From Swiss-Prot:
<dbReference type="GO" id="GO:0006412">
    <property type="term" value="P:translation"/>
</dbReference>
<dbReference type="InterPro" id="IPR006075">
    <property type="entry name" value="Asn/Gln-tRNA_Trfase_suB/E_cat"/>
</dbReference>
<dbReference type="GO" id="GO:0005524">
    <property type="term" value="F:ATP binding"/>
</dbReference>
<keyword id="KW-0648">Protein biosynthesis</keyword>
<dbReference type="Pfam" id="PF02934">
    <property type="entry name" value="GatB_N"/>
</dbReference>
<dbReference type="Pfam" id="PF02637">
    <property type="entry name" value="GatB_Yqey"/>
</dbReference>
<keyword id="KW-0067">ATP-binding</keyword>
<dbReference type="InterPro" id="IPR042114">
    <property type="entry name" value="GatB_C_1"/>
</dbReference>
<dbReference type="InterPro" id="IPR014746">
    <property type="entry name" value="Gln_synth/guanido_kin_cat_dom"/>
</dbReference>
<dbReference type="GO" id="GO:0050566">
    <property type="term" value="F:asparaginyl-tRNA synthase (glutamine-hydrolyzing) activity"/>
</dbReference>
<comment type="similarity">
    <text>Belongs to the GatB/GatE family. GatB subfamily.</text>
</comment>
<dbReference type="GO" id="GO:0050567">
    <property type="term" value="F:glutaminyl-tRNA synthase (glutamine-hydrolyzing) activity"/>
</dbReference>
<dbReference type="InterPro" id="IPR017959">
    <property type="entry name" value="Asn/Gln-tRNA_amidoTrfase_suB/E"/>
</dbReference>
<dbReference type="GO" id="GO:0070681">
    <property type="term" value="P:glutaminyl-tRNAGln biosynthesis via transamidation"/>
</dbReference>
<keyword id="KW-0547">Nucleotide-binding</keyword>
<dbReference type="InterPro" id="IPR023168">
    <property type="entry name" value="GatB_Yqey_C_2"/>
</dbReference>
<dbReference type="InterPro" id="IPR004413">
    <property type="entry name" value="GatB"/>
</dbReference>
């Protein structure tokens, strides 16, 4: 029997506001433990939460970007549970009226086709703290993360393969990143994914029993975990077994999913309206104000790059994969840079440098201005493409002007025949054996002189001019 895969994803995104959702404490990641806290985060008696308007702004932007309807009658709810990293013993979240609902996002699959994935809801809530278990036998609680604003985006169970889940996450990350409401860095926990997967016989409308997957710390692991679950569940069902409702985690070492706990039933969080936060309305004017702050999204940029700039679909996809790269490209083209040349540099030397250095485009000194200037001095013959790679590394590490550096470093390409011809004659004098080979008609003997000349000029000879002059001077030798 063959089975249809059914997947839904729950994605928690940390919003990049300066302060937390209900307290004025910094929401910055990476500080020493328990330094980004105050009496609200510790839930001291008598303290009251105050809603950060910037969090609602971000929620509205996310809802609009994901084609969602917006609940304009806003309130928060208490989700009751006890855990050491949750000092209040409840989480302030949204239950029956999330900020966004009934949305969708279009994703591009590997075969080039597109699919629309439904989004059930997006709700605002506070993050919990973090537990760590020490080697000394003690467990520690860090409340820096307590109260950091989250938006949880819950998809419909519309994905029918791990590939579609991967494509959905890629598209979702792009859209959220472009809105500017989060950096969506999984390695820092600002984007976290839980996956629900079940199988059912083809043609059956009722969903099968689902398994929840956790510990998915990369899109690649989401895909691998789901692929493993498809095989595991299919094997059980084909052997006549029954799928239990479980929570499992993906283990990178064994490339398998491992049981965490069996779910006997749905958790009862005893939701009720948050009494310490007032009800409020999201006005039409507020929504429209947030709409005006939305950027051009990746899909639209890709189409424009192909139609107006003449780039290939591949190049357009690569350039828009991150907003930082796309914005850099936009700025360079606006300065007069050739779109194809800028694209080639960003996908080639720049990408290789970033990978080697373990840095992002924002962390190096390259700017649209000095990249465009460097491309211009390649085009006008001031430097060769080979020397340009050296110039680029300098610009990436130190910044500054491309032309200024080239002139100071003595890297200007030699194109003047009056300078090159004497060097060619010296090359001939220094390589008598090669001259003899050439005069005797030895095959490809003339090609050796190109290398000799480039070595003599430390790579600064203009290749086109140098080859033409070499051919001219070698022809004279032959006549002699």
């Amino acid at each position: 029997m063959n089975f249809e895969t059914v997947i839904g994803l729950e994605v928690h995104v940390e919003l990049n506001t300066n302060s937390k959702i209900f307290s004025p404490t910094s929401a910055h990641f990476g500080n020493e433990q328990n330094t980004n806290t105050n009496v609200i985060d510790w839930s001291f008696p008598g303290v009251l939460p105050v809603l950060n308007k910037g969090v609602v702004d971000a929620g509205i932007k996310a809802a609009l970007a994901l084609n969602m309807d917006i609940h304009q009658h806003m309130h928060f709810d208490r989700k009751n549970y006890f855990y050491p990293d949750n000092p209040k013993a409840y989480q302030i979240s949204q239950f029956d009226e999330p900020i966004g609902y009934n949305g969708w996002i279009e994703v591009q699959l590997e075969d080039g086709t597109t699919k629309k994935i439904g989004i059930e809801r997006a709700h605002l809530e506070e993050d919990a703290g973090k537990n760590t278990h020490g080697t000394d036998g003690f467990s520690y609680v860090d409340l820096n993360r307590q109260g950091v604003p989250l938006i949880e985006i819950v998809s419909e169970a519309d994905m029918r393969s791990p590939e579609e889940a991967y494509a959905y996450l890629t598209a979702l990350k792009e859209v959220i990143q472009y809105t500017g409401i989060s950096d969506v860095k999984m390695e820092e926990g600002s984007m976290r994914v839980d996956a629900n997967i079940s199988l059912r016989p083809y043609g059956q409308e009722e969903f099968g029993t689902k398994t929840e997957l956790k510990n998915l710390n990369s899109f690649s692991n989401v895909r691998k975990g789901l692929e493993y679950e498809v095989q595991r569940q299919a094997k059980i069902l084909r052997s006549g077994g029954v799928i239990r409702q479980e929570t499992r985690r993906y283990d990178e070492a064994s490339k398998s999913t491992i049981l965490m706990r069996v779910k006997e039933g749905a958790a009862d969080y005893r939701y009720f309206p948050e009494p310490d936060l007032p009800l409020f309305e999201i006005s039409d004017e507020w929504i429209e104000e947030m709409r005006t702050e939305l950027p051009e999204f990746p899909k639209d940029r890709r189409a424009r790059y192909v139609a107006e700039l003449g780039l290939s679909d591949y190049d357009a996809n690569q350039l828009t994969a991150t907003k930082v790269t796309s914005d850099f490209f936009e700025a360079a083209v606006a300065l007069g840079g050739d779109a194809k040349q800028v694209s080639n540099w960003l996908q080639g030397e720049v990408a290789q440098f970033l990978n080697a250095e373990g840095k992002t485009l924002e962390e190096i000194q390259l700017t649209p201005e000095n990249l465009v200037e460097m491309i211009a001095i390649i085009e006008d013959g001031t430097i060769s493409s080979k020397i340009a790679k050296k110039v680029f590394v300098h610009l990436a590490k130190n910044g500054g002007g491309a032309r200024e550096y080239v002139e100071k470093a003595g890297l200007v390409q030699i194109s003047d025949p009056e300078v090159l011809i004497p060097i060619i004659h010296q090359v001939f004098a220094d390589n008598e054996a090669a001259i003899a080979d050439f005069k005797s008609g030895k095959r490809n003997a003339d090609k050796a002189f190109t290398g000799f000349l480039m070595k003599a000029t430390k790579g600064q000879a203009n290749p086109q001019v140098a080859l033409k002059l070499l051919a001219q001077e070698l022809a004279k030798l032959k006549e002699d």
